[in-house]
């Protein structure tokens, strides 16, 4: 559950006809900072009517190796076949705002909702985004 009045950094994420808002919640200076989600019930619904949204969360959290996951952005691989989340984490468990920037691949679940998996420490090498089908420049 997110602390009241501590929701920030909303980002829109669209998967086909599904609309999500992923946002940071909690206290940004603590290791419990995390991401939660709003899902629009129907794409034809009024976006400004709160009854048209389903609130769920947390959808992406820290763990024993990663602290204070928050402020996400989303992109795709150069060839458009993969989805990536860009986010920050705390450097350590102590209160404060020292951050690491992280990037990892995510998928959309069977119901079309984003599934971010487990937040990975910065020491874990991530695969490069897919570039298949794109002309590669040789140096």
Give short role names for the model-derived ranges.
Residues 4-139:
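Carbohydrate-active catalytic/glycan-binding domains of CAZyme proteins
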